[in-house]
């Protein structure tokens, strides 16, 4: 979900994804509505969807240039060895969000990612947070990008990227 909300285009939750339905949708049966009240199963996913919607609304970088090439830049799209993608989203105002997604079942420690600017980047989303039912692998809320060029960008940061998770970093200066 963290990847879909940060990537260009609009989001689509289909038939129970927001409650963690494990069965494929079928026109022959209804949704598993009991998952809504199952804190252990669906509670974390519901909290994540609420946070994703709030972050999306509050970060113009994620929506203001959805149909413009100037609103998106790949950081890394070819790291098949680590099963990761990283990209940037931009708003005309200067608002910038970096999204790093790990599709592997293992965390990546010290994973270097290029960023356009040095300074403080706040970790505004970590889908592996314990509040969503994850393991809590993260970056303690913020990272400091240093003047180490990486991925063709002027700065970079070393991250803890959670397993099967997404991390969003928002530039704060």
Task: List PLM regions with ranges.
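Carbohydrate-interacting/catalytic domains
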Residues: 3-13, 17-173
């Amino acid at each position: 979900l963290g990847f879909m909300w940060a990537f260009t285009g609009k989001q689509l939750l289909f038939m129970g994804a927001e409650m963690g339905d494990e069965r494929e949708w079928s026109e022959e049966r209804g949704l598993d509505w009991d998952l809504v009240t199952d804190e252990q199963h669906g509670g974390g996913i519901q909290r994540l969807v609420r946070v994703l919607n709030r972050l999306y609304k509050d970060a113009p970088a994620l929506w203001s240039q959805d149909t413009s090439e100037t609103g998106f830049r790949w950081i890394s799209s070819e790291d098949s060895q680590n099963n990761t993608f990283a990209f940037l989203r931009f708003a005309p105002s200067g608002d910038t969000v970096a999204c790093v997604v790990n599709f592997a079942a293992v965390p990546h420690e010290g994973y270097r990612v290029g960023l356009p600017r040095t300074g403080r980047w706040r970790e505004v989303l970590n889908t592996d947070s314990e509040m969503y039912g994850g393991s809590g692998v993260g970056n303690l809320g913020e990272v400091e990008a240093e003047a180490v060029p990486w991925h063709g960008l002027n700065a970079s940061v070393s991250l803890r990227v959670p397993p099967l998770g997404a991390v969003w970093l928002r530039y704060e200066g």
